[in-house]
A protein has these predicted regions:
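Hydrophobic, helix-length membrane anchors
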Residues: 1-21
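Cytosolic nucleotide-binding catalytic cores of signal-transduction proteins
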Residues: 19-146
């Protein structure tokens, strides 16, 4: 729990009841479970586990939690679905690395996509453009000349 701020704790304190759309029932998630999952997610991010292809179910298993809980916690805390959460982490990581590692600027788009865990160049390009406003090749050409 070392990386969790008081704001996150307070925010998740309000997450006791989450609606399960498929059964139209209420799932109760205790504060302890929420904080535990958030701590494990923070650890996952710090260890850059998002750089490998990963699914909601495989991450839930790795974090020793329920996929529905994990999905709801990500949806509520990050205000995005699981795929967007993972892909955004990947793009943020790449943008940071491009600032410090000039060798990455020489990679092909396909190689960059695979290096940060994307299975397809198309998904990488779409996410990259959504995040930066530029397609990857334009962005790389721009930073190469700086």
């Amino acid at each position: 729990m070392s990386l969790l701020s008081k704001n996150i704790k307070n925010f998740f304190w309000s997450l006791f009841k989450l609606k399960n759309e498929s059964q139209n029932s209420i799932i109760e998630i205790s504060q302890d479970i929420i904080l535990n999952v958030m701590d494990k997610l923070s650890n996952f991010e710090n260890k850059q586990g998002f750089l490998k292809p990963i699914s909601l179910h495989s991450l839930a298993k790795k974090l020793q939690t329920n996929p529905k809980y994990l999905s709801k916690i990500i949806n509520t805390h990050y205000e995005k679905n699981f795929s967007s959460y993972i892909n955004d982490l990947r793009i943020q990581y790449l943008l940071k690395e491009l600032k410090t590692d000039d060798s990455l600027k020489k990679y092909t788009i396909k190689t960059l996509a695979k290096k940060i865990g994307f299975r397809s160049t198309e998904a990488f390009s779409k996410t990259f453009k959504k995040h930066t406003g530029f397609n990857p090749s334009t962005y790389l050409n721009t930073i190469k000349h700086k």
